[in-house]
Curated annotation (Swiss-Prot):
Induction: Induced by bacterial lipopolysaccharide and phorbol myristate acetate in neutrophils. Phosphorylated at Ser-285 when localized to the cytoplasm, PKP3 at desmosome cell junctions is not phosphorylated. Phosphorylation at Try-195 by SRC is induced by reactive oxygen species and potentially acts as a release mechanism from desmosome cell-cell junctions. One of its GO terms (biological process) is regulation of cytokine production involved in immune response. The gene is Pkp3. Residues 58-81, 219-241, 253-274 are annotated as: Disordered. Expressed in all layers of the epidermis, but is most abundant in the basal layer (at protein level). Expressed in keratinocytes of the epidermis at birth (at protein level). Expressed in the anagen non-keratinized inner root sheath cuticle and hair cuticle (at protein level). Also expressed in the matrix, precursors of the inner root sheath and hair shaft lineages (at protein level). Expressed at apical membranes in the outer hair root sheath and basal layer keratinocytes (at protein level). Expressed in intestinal epithelial cells and lamina propria of the ileum (at protein level). The record marks S285 as: Interacts with SFN. Gene3D superfamilies: Leucine-rich Repeat Variant. This is Plakophilin-3.
Amino acid sequence: MQEGNFLLSALQPETGVCSLALPSDLQLDRRGAEGPEADRLRAARVQEQVRARLLQLGQQSRHNGSAELDGSAESARGMPRGQYHTMQTGFSSRSQGMSGDKTSTFRPIAKPAYSPASWSSRSAVDLTCSRRLSSAHNGGSAFGAVGYGGTQPTPPMPTRPVSFHERGGAASRADYDTLSLRSLRLGPGGLDDRYSVVSEQLEPAAASTYRAYAYERQASSGSSRAGGLDWPEATEGPPSRTIRAPAMRTLQRFQSSHRSRGGTGSVSGAGLEPVARAPSVRSLSLSLADSGHLPDVRGLDSYTGHRTLQRLSSGFDDIDLPSAVKYLMASDPNLQVLGAAYIQHRCYSDAAAKKQARSLQAVPRLVKLFNHANQEVQRHATGAMRNLIYDNVDNKLALVEENGIFELLRTLREQDDELRKNVTGILWNLSSSDHLKDRLARDTLEQLTDLVLSPLSGAGGPPLIQQNASEAEIFYNATGFLRNLSSASQATRQKMRECHGLVDALVTYINHALDVGKCEDKSVENAVCVLRNLSYRLYDEMPPSALQRLEGRGRRDMAGAPPGEMVGCFTPQSRRLRELPLTADALTFAEVSKDPKGLEWLWSPQIVGLYNRLLQRCELNRHTTEAAAGALQNITAGDRRWAGVLSRLALEQERILNPLLDRVRTADHNQLRSLTGLIRNLSRNARNKDEMSTKVVSHLIEKLPGSVGEKCPPAEVLVNIIAVLNNLVVASPIAARDLLYFDGLRKLVFIKKKRDSPDSEKSSRAASSLLANLWQYSKLHRDFRAKGYRKEDFLGP
């Protein structure tokens, strides 16, 4: 049996040969005993042995004055090292806590009693001690509740703490000190959209209680700034857990090497990489002196050859930012790592430190380390830059001016997930600056698509099976970067549409997420928002040749032709003629590729089905559904023929109206903008307005305010709702009847008379137009008067 699979008992034996293993049923000749009674007796015997053993341990700990058993006590008992043949020499039952200090691992806890349900002969391993060790370094007593940015007290144990990344197993412990912190999901909140048909980005000041790593989570489509509690993925771990950032881990590694030189406990199959010994103060000064940059290290004269500095005995608290910047120019990679880690730590949330670092020329020196021969230096340099430019426009400009974009794209070619996470995070941070978006789009789109989007979406090769955690974060950062760029200028949108493979990668990823049930994923949200933004003003910005093809190659739309120009055997009111528009729409699908590529996806009939699936299946992430509705609003907007074709396709083939109305019932104001805008477009192009009126009118009237105290949606939503009702009332008497029946007149009159702001003026004018059209139904005048309304209410100012 391999050592990694050998499970030791957590109950410490009295002597070296003691064991709590029970005789087998064969040995007791109880194989054929009465089943339940035999199990009960065996469980009772186990409980008695456990209780007696715990009592002995409790007495022994009180007698010794401590619950810890040191190595000398172990040897005094004469525990034979070679008793268990499956164990290697030096492994003891106390080493399973994975701590570096053998004397502080096992802490027996006296428990009063145990029921048969809580103990058995197979439950001997008590993990309480192991949990206590790990919790001390993940939000526990070692750092308290201050988080990463707080002051780090002196850890009680002299050995290096077990980090959050080490708990995942041997594979995740390979790069213990160089792993960058996994960015957690930002939660959504409220941010007003300025446009009804374009996704916008989040303000740089957006904050979250789950933002354990400082960088811009800029987002489009009205993404918000509230805490992360309303996004379910943010609750993967305990909310109170403190996660140490890479800079803190590096500083603590150097600190740990100064405090203790003791060996760590054996870990089965751990395979930890040997960590280079932290340089002494003398080696620091000599190395920097060789390079011509001698730092001002306080207390240097107090150094002796056999002890470290007393001022540094508690860690590297005496390092300042100027010294850390000078370390970046050292020839020793250890010094460069230390300097970058300190800058990363200081610039986490300190605006003054970011400004000071820029004045000390930290930005150009970090850029030179992006493609260093030592990968650990690369990781810490990019991690430091990621914090340095967060919410700091001047540092972003300095990075771009130092040819940082070119160096970042070179680094992106490295096959190291930690580096790629940092690089894509830096690009996302840069994209939050409006004046950098056009340049970023020009310099990065093609390489980012080839190196990240296509491989990780499955569009550029074999089908995507599943992304690992690092790949998921890399793709998330990349789509967040695109989400910001897509909300920029028309030229940037056009460049993104024409970028080979970009739209294909996004559509492929969304389809895959829907197939595997991950439509709530934040990367899906980013991808849908990008498609929404790229669909903005699509028919005005698309290639003329494609637009001509969508308009029917010069063929007249029979639905809009005057009756006198119709040639054929059918009268204008015949059933055959009414069916012609549907046939014409079906024929136009032959003019669109059945296998769309690139920007063809944006107006393809297949994309309507994709958005409809998102509306039906995405229940939790409201930003995804808002973006899907906004994208449909974009491609059905305007007077273009193809907008009408896609509107009728959504209504008649995709049956999208019921999912939309379900969303309207529970939608917030941001969602209502997109949903009501889409329904407005559909109501213009619907063939059967009577059927649509029966489904829509009652739901929309519920959203209208009828008095001063009632909750009122934004003016833009009110205008959309009134426009939908107007489109239906003009063509359908059923809509006028339902509007009267569901008390819509009272609400419309209230909106018409409310003119206390510029926004309410817009909704008042819309209500006046609708009331005037209602008065045209003379058969309803008696019903109007019966409810107390006069002609002046409909036609008056």
